[in-house]
C-alpha cells in the first residue's frame, strides 16, 4: 500500500479460522505486524486459546477489524463466539496437512453463522514442495465444493518468508469490497437500534470498565444510554474506540466501549448491550435448523427433545430442540424448522444465527437462522405459519408481514408487527403501504392510531360481530341495543377497548351493526324489538284514551292487551318519557288527552264556584269515584295546576 494512500475505516470484520497449529497467529502477525496471542499461556503453548482482535490495513486503504479464533477442539465455544460477526473469513489450511477436523468444524460454524465470503490461505508453503501444495489445494477445493464457499480463492502463502502475503492482501481487499455495499445498507437502517454482544470485559486504570464486541444493526455514540441483558444493567457510553478514539461507531465494526453506571464492572462475556425497550430476550424461538451430526463420529439421528447447548452472539444457554408434531428424528444433513426451548433467557432477534452443540460431550451438531425470536409453546405448525417462515427465510418482508397478520385474530398496530418480527418500523410501514394498496390488508383508525388487519381476518371479525348481535337480540328480543363493552366481550374476548371501538366502527361502516347513543345494535333485530314496543305503546294509549278518567290499573291494562311484563315495562317507560301518559297513582296512569281533559273540567268547576271549590264539587265535575278524584286532584296539585288551602276548609283554586 502506498504511503500516501488515504485510510478509510470499513465496517467489515475479517476472521481467521482453521485447524490448530496451521499457522493462524503467524499469518496474522505477517499481515499486521502484531502477534494476536494476548495471553502468556498462548505465547507459551504456541496456540490461540482465547479470542484475538486487531486491525488490518488493506492495499486500497480500507482498515478492517481482524479476529483470530482458537483452532483447538477444546476451545470450540471460544471459536463460535469469535466467529460471530465475521463478514469475510480467512480459512487457514496447512499445505503440509491439508483439511483437518477443525478445518471442517470451523467451516461448518462459519456457514451456520451466515458468513458467505471466504479466502483460503494455504500456509506453510515453505515447508511443502509444489506437488504437496497442489494436492493440498485440491483437497481444500474438494471440501469446499459442498459448502456455500465453493470456488473460494486459494492463495498459497508463507508467513515465515512472506511469500504470497501481498497476493493474499489483494484478494482480501476484493472480498471486503464485495461486502462494502451491504455494509452501507446496514449503516443506513436509521430505524434500527444498536446491539453489542460482549466478548470481553475488563477494567483500565483511570478509565474504568471497558467492554468489547462486534457492533450490530445500528451506530452507537458517546453519551448513548444502554442496557445489558440478561442482567438488565443500565449504563452510559463514556468513550468509544474503533482503531482509535471516535465519537461514533458503525455496525459491523469491532468496538471498545468505556461504560459508566452501577454494576458495569460485573458485566461479562455472553451479555448483550442494547437500547432498553428496543431489544429483548427469549425462552422459546423458532429457527431453521441444519443437523450436521458429530464430526468424526458415526452418523446417528437426532431425536426431538434432545438437550443441547445453544450459542448466539457471545452467549450460551442450555435448551432442547423440539420437532413439530408427528415429525420423525432428523438424519445427518437434514434441515427443518424446529422450536428451541431454553432453560435460561437468551438475548435474540429474528435473523440472528445460532450454533447448536451437543450437551455431552460438547461437540458441534448444527445450527441455523432464527425465524421468530418469540413463539407460543406448541409443536403444531399451521399452514399459515409455514408461509410465514418461508417468507422470513427468503427475506420477503412484505410476505412475512402479510403472513403474520393472517395469523392474528384481531387488528394490531405497526409497532406490534415490528416487535413480533424484529423489523424496523420503516420496513414495516413500507410493506404495509403495498399490502393496503393491493387490498390484502385493511387499515382501521381509532382516535389518532391506525390499526392493521388481514382482509380475511377482518371479514371473520365482522361475521363474529353479526353472529354476536343476532344471539344477543335473540336472548333479549325486547332490547333495542347493548353497550359496546358487552358486544365486544362477546364477539372478541381478547380485544382491548381501542381495538373493539375500531371493529365496531368498521361494522357500522359495513352495515353489520349500528350505534345510537351508548348502544350498539343489529339494525334489523333492534328495529323488530322497537316495533314490538312501539305497537304496545299505541295500544296502551288507545285503551287509556277510550277509558278517559276512569282508566284501569296498569296491571289490568297489560292483562287486557295480553302484553308480557317486559314489553309492558319498556312501553310504559317509553310513554312516560314522551309524556304520552301521566301517572296519577303508583299503578294508575291517564293518557295525555285524558289528563288535559281533567284540567279543563277542574278549571271550569273552580271558575263556576267563584274561584275556589271543594273536593266534593270537583269530584262531581270529574265524574269519577272519590278515590280516583282525589288521585287526579293530588296530581294536579303536584304539577302546580291547582293549590289546596287546608285552612280554608280544603278548598282548591287555580294557581
What are the residue ranges of the model-derived segments?
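Conserved catalytic-core segments of large NTP-driven translation/proteostasis enzymes
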Residues: 6, 125, 142-295
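C-terminal effector modules of nucleic-acid-centric enzymes and ribosome-associated factors
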Residues: 128-133, 142, 243-244, 262-583, ...
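Conserved G1/Walker A P-loop phosphate-binding module
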Residues: 2-69
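Conserved Switch II/interswitch segment of TRAFAC-class P-loop GTPases
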Residues: 69-74, 84-106, 111, 115-135
Amino acid at each position: 500500500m502506498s504511503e500516501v494512500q488515504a485510510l478509510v475505516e470499513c465496517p467489515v470484520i475479517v476472521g481467521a479460522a482453521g485447524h490448530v497449529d496451521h499457522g493462524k497467529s503467524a499469518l496474522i502477525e505477517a499481515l499486521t505486524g502484531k502477534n494476536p496471542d494476548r495471553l502468556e499461556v498462548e505465547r507459551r503453548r504456541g496456540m490461540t486459546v482465547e479470542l484475538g482482535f486487531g486491525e488490518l490495513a488493506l492495499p486500497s486503504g480500507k482498515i478492517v477489524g481482524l479476529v483470530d479464533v482458537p483452532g483447538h477442539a477444546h476451545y470450540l465455544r471460544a471459536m463460535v463466539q469469535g466467529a460471530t460477526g465475521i463478514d469475510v473469513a480467512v480459512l487457514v489450511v496447512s499445505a503440509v496437512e491439508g483439511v483437518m477436523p477443525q478445518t471442517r468444524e470451523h467451516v461448518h460454524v462459519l456457514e451456520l453463522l451466515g458468513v458467505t465470503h471466504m479466502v483460503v490461505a494455504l500456509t506453510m508453503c515453505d515447508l511443502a514442495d509444489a506437488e504437496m501444495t497442489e494436492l493440498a489445494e485440491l483437497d481444500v477445493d474438494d471440501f469446499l465444493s459442498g459448502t456455500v464457499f465453493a470456488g473460494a480463492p486459494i492463495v498459497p502463502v508463507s508467513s515465515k518468508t512472506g511469500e504470497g502475503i501481498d497476493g493474499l492482501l489483494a484478494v482480501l481487499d476484493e472480498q471486503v469490497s464485495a461486502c462494502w455495499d451491504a455494509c452501507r445498507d446496514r449503516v443506513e437502517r436509521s430505524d434500527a437500534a444498536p446491539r453489542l454482544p460482549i466478548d470481553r470485559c475488563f477494567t483500565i486504570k483511570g478509565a474504568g470498565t471497558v467492554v468489547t464486541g462486534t457492533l450490530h444493526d445500528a451506530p452507537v455514540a458517546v453519551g448513548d444510554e444502554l442496557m445489558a441483558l440478561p442482567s438488565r444493567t443500565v449504563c452510559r457510553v463514556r468513550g468509544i474506540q474503533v482503531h482509535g478514539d471516535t465519537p461514533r461507531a458503525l455496525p459491523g465494526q469491532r468496538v471498545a466501549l468505556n461504560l459508566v453506571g452501577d454494576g458495569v464492572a460485573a458485566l461479562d462475556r455472553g451479555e448483550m448491550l442494547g437500547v432498553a425497550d428496543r431489544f429483548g430476550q427469549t425462552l422459546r424461538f423458532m429457527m431453521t435448523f441444519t443437523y450436521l451430526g458429530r464430526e468424526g463420529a458415526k452418523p446417528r439421528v437426532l431425536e426431538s427433545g434432545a438437550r443441547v447447548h445453544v450459542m448466539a452472539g457471545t452467549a450460551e444457554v442450555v435448551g432442547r430442540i423440539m420437532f413439530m408434531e408427528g415429525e420423525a428424528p432428523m438424519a445427518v444433513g437434514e434441515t427443518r424448522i424446529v422450536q428451541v426451548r431454553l432453560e435460561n433467557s437468551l438475548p435474540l432477534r429474528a435473523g440472528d444465527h445460532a450454533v447448536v452443540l451437543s450437551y455431552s460431550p460438547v461437540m458441534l451438531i448444527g445450527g441455523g437462522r432464527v425465524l421468530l425470536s418469540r413463539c407460543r409453546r406448541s409443536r403444531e405448525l399451521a399452514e399459515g405459519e409455514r408461509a410465514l417462515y418461508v417468507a422470513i427465510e427468503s427475506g420477503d418482508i412484505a410476505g412475512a408481514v402479510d403472513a403474520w397478520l393472517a395469523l392474528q385474530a384481531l387488528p394490531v398496530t405497526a409497532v406490534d408487527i415490528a416487535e413480533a418480527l424484529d423489523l424496523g418500523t420503516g420496513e414495516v410501514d413500507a410493506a404495509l403501504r403495498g399490502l393496503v394498496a393491493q387490498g390484502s390488508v385493511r387499515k382501521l383508525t381509532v382516535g389518532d392510531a391506525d390499526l392493521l388487519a388481514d382482509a380475511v381476518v377482518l371479514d371473520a371479525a365482522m361475521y363474529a360481530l353479526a353472529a354476536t348481535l343476532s344471539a344477543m337480540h335473540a336472548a333479549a328480543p325486547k332490547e333495542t341495543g347493548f353497550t359496546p363493552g358487552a358486544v365486544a366481550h362477546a364477539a372478541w374476548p381478547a380485544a382491548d377497548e381501542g381495538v373493539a371501538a375500531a371493529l365496531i366502527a368498521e361494522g357500522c361502516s359495513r352495515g353489520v351493526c349500528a350505534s345510537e347513543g351508548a348502544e350498539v345494535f343489529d339494525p334489523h333485530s333492534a328495529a323488530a324489538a322497537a316495533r314490538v314496543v312501539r305497537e304496545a305503546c299505541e295500544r296502551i294509549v288507545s285503551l287509556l284514551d277510550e277509558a278517559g278518567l276512569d282508566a284501569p290499573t296498569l296491571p289490568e291494562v297489560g292483562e287486557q292487551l295480553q302484553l308480557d311484563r317486559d314489553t309492558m315495562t319498556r312501553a310504559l317507560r317509553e310513554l312516560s318519557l314522551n309524556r304520552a301518559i301521566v301517572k296519577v297513582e303508583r299503578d294508575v296512569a291517564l293518557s295525555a288527552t285524558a289528563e288535559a281533559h281533567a284540567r279543563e273540567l277542574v278549571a271550569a268547576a273552580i271558575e263556576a264556584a267563584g274561584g275556589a271549590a271543594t273536593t266534593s264539587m270537583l269530584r262531581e265535575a270529574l265524574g269519577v269515584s272519590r278515590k280516583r278524584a282525589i288521585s287526579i286532584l293530588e296530581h294536579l296539585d303536584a304539577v302546580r295546576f291547582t293549590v289546596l288551602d287546608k285552612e280554608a276548609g280544603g278548598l282548591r283554586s287555580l294557581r
